[in-house]
Every structure is written in structure tokens, then in C-alpha cells.
């Protein structure tokens, strides 16, 4: 669904609170909250549908953070999660529901297109919206109640290109991207400019659509163009299949991905074909930080597997929300919480020290990662 249509739905939704009645949320109450003041927090996520892998990882990280916060006792976070199924209309309905419930802050949503659709609602309601994995350009332009803790493409992708160009020395690159996904179209445009800025020749550009499963025609054309490297802007479902087909065709070039490639599901789908994939992320389990080491240890003990980028980002989001309320001295005044969030500086998070700039974007160091033997490993350039 086009996000502009989502905005129209959003505007109508403010006048139709009855539309919210059909949604169900998941409460986040925990024992041991101590004497902390209760904060009504919303969490817009996608734990089913096409984005479930990302959303379930986010839920794990978020749930763990909330339990830690409530156990500490300074603040008790009473969380209501709403599942959008990766659908813009569902996201709009979720926003209406959480606004009607007078949440002090809302974390999410997961998808950039959803954020664009619901952002104006929260801006109008004066409730801070803290995006988790929303990296598309223009989101922070919606208003001063908009934040995200994931580095935007305008910073992430150019660093991927700059570092891999220096590391690998490629001169000719082919690009393949999803043209019916707003986030990936935005990623393609950013990749294109970054490659041009590095003086790299783009020898082929091909497109696909979300939920496609056959990429033979596009990859045959790319194979014939004989690039030194391939850029793929897509989510893990299509990305994993693209990687497998590339390797089947004898294409062993390095692959540059965007935020959509930061999922263990990509490796599960692609298998050994995922090796030699490069992405940039603020999250790395190898980061030399006590906060990172503790998060990884606690997460492994709780879930019996390693955290990914999305789990880490959601964990950090919950901690940022709690820190903002603590600094604001309130769990009910959204304006004061918004102001406190905007003034967070050098917050020691599991993803590194974090500061919000004047636009609501995070200032945090990025790490270049390479998939080797099925693991995302930090690369020094």
C-alpha cells in the first residue's frame, strides 16, 4: 500500500476511534516493579506476516529490556504491543489504538512505510515515536516528536560502499533491488549515489518485487555484465534466494546489502551462499563494550541463541525510552519525555554510545560486517 494512502487513512482514523476496537495487544506487566511509577508504553511491531523474522527478534530484545527495567524498579513499563503483520493499514489502526490509550511513548514500527503512515498521527497527538529498524530517508522530517535508534541509509549505505570499495577495490558493480518496496527503492537510490561518489561504474540495474521467487532472468543479465561486485537491496526472504541463485550461476562476487540483510534468516535460506555478503550496522556482537558483552551474555542465557541487529535495536529502544522518562522525572507527560529523549547524550547502549542529533537520528559508530561460515563478523578496514 502506498504510504500517501496510509496518511489519508490515518487522518480519517483520528475521527473514528471505533476502528481501533478490533485490535488486540499483549500486556507487558511484570513482577518485581518495586515502587517505580507506571509508564503506559506502546510497541508497534510485526510478529507475523512477511516481516515476522525481524519482528520476533525485536520482541525478544524488547521483552528482555522491559523485564530488566521493571526489575530495577525506578520505572514500571506497562507495555501494549500491537502486531501490524507488516501491513500499513494495520499500522495505522495500531497507532489509533495506542493514541486513544494515551501512551506516554510508543516504540516502533518496524517498517519504514509504516512509520511514514503513522508518524503524522503521533506528531499530531504529541506522543514521541521511537522507530526501531526504520532507516528510510525523510522519516524525521515528519516532526519533532519523531525519533529512531537505527542509523539512516544516508549514513549507513555510503559507509558500506566506502569501506568495501577500499577493502575490495571493485570498479564495476551491478545493482538488483525491490521496486515495489519503498524502503528498498530508497536504499537503491542511496546506493547509486554512493557508488557514483566513489567513482564506481554501475554496469547493470535490475529489479524484482517482494515475494518473487524466480530471479533467473535478472541474474543472467547481471552475470553477462561481468561485475566485480553486486548490490542487493531487499529483505531476507528474497535476498536469500537471490544469493543461492547467484552461486548456482557461478557468480562468486561479493554482495553488498542494506539493513534488510541483517537477519540470521538470510543465512538460513541461503546457506553457504550467504558467505561474502557485506553490510554495515551499528550492532556487532564483537563490539568492545561492557554493555554489549552483558547484553549478548544475558540474551544467550535467556533465549539459547545469539541476538541479531533487530533484537539489539529493540532492546536499546526500550532502554532509551526508560532513560528518557527517568531523566524527565515523569511517566505520564509525553512532552517532557520527548524533550528528555531529544537531549540524551552518550547513552551507553548495547549497540554503542548513542546521542540523538537535532533531527531525531542517532549518532553512533557503524561496524562493517561480513558473513563468514554463516556468522556476521566484524571487518577492520
What do these predicted ranges mean?
Residues 42-61, 82-88, 111-112, 176-185, ...:
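Extracytoplasmic "Venus flytrap"
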Amino acid at each position: 500500500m502506498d504510504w500517501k494512502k496510509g496518511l489519508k487513512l490515518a487522518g480519517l482514523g483520528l475521527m473514528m476511534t471505533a476502528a481501533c476496537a478490533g485490535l488486540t495487544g499483549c500486556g507487558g506487566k511484570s513482577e518485581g516493579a518495586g515502587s517505580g511509577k507506571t509508564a503506559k508504553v506502546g510497541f508497534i511491531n510485526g510478529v507475523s506476516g512477511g516481516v515476522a523474522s525481524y519482528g520476533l527478534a525485536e520482541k525478544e530484545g524488547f521483552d528482555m529490556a522491559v523485564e530488566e527495567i521493571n526489575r530495577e524498579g525506578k520505572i514500571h513499563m506497562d507495555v501494549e504491543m500491537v502486531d501490524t503483520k507488516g501491513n500499513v493499514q494495520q499500522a495505522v489502526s495500531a497507532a489509533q489504538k495506542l493514541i486513544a490509550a494515551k501512551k506516554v511513548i510508543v516504540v516502533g514500527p518496524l517498517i519504514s512505510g509504516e512509520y511514514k503512515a503513522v508518524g503524522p498521527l503521533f506528531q499530531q497527538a504529541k506522543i514521541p515515536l521511537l522507530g526501531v529498524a526504520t532507516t528510510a530517508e525523510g522519516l524525521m522530517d515528519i516532526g519533532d516528536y519523531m525519533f529512531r535508534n537505527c542509523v539512516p541509509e544516508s549514513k549507513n549505505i555510503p559507509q558500506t560502499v566506502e569501506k568495501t570499495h577500499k577493502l575490495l577495490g571493485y570498479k564495476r558493480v551491478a545493482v538488483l533491488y525491490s521496486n515495489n518496496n519503498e524502503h528498498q527503492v530508497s536504499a537503491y537510490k542511496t546506493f547509486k549515489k554512493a557508488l557514483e561518489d566513489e567513482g564506481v561504474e554501475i554496469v547493470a540495474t535490475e529489479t524484482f518485487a517482494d515475494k518473487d521467487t524466480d530471479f533467473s532472468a535478472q541474474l543472467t543479465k547481471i552475470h553477462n555484465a561481468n561485475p566485480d561486485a553486486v548490490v542487493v537491496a531487499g529483505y531476507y526472504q528474497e535476498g536469500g534466494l537471490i544469493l543461492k541463485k547467484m552461486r548456482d550461476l557461478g557468480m562468486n562476487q561479493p554482495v553488498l546489502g542494506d539493513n534488510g540483510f541483517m537477519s540470521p534468516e538470510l543465512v538460513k535460506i541461503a546457506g553457504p551462499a550467504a558467505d561474502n555478503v557485506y553490510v554495515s550496522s551499528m550492532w556487532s556482537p564483537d563490539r568492545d563494550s561492557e554493555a554489549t558483552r552483558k547484553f549478548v551474555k544475558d540474551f544467550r542465557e535467556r533465549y539459547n541463541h545469539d541476538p541479531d541487529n533487530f533484537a539489539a535495536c529493540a532492546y536499546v529502544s526500550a532502554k532509551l525510552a526508560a532513560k528518557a522518562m527517568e531523566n524527565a522525572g515523569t511517566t505520564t507527560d509525553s512532552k517532557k519525555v520527548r524533550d528528555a529523549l531529544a537531549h540524551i547524550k552518550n547513552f551507553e547502549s548495547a549497540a554503542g554510545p548513542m546521542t540523538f542529533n537535532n533531527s531525531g537520528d542517532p549518532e553512533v559508530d557503524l561496524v562493517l560486517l561480513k558473513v563468514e561460515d554463516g556468522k556476521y563478523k566484524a571487518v577492520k578496514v
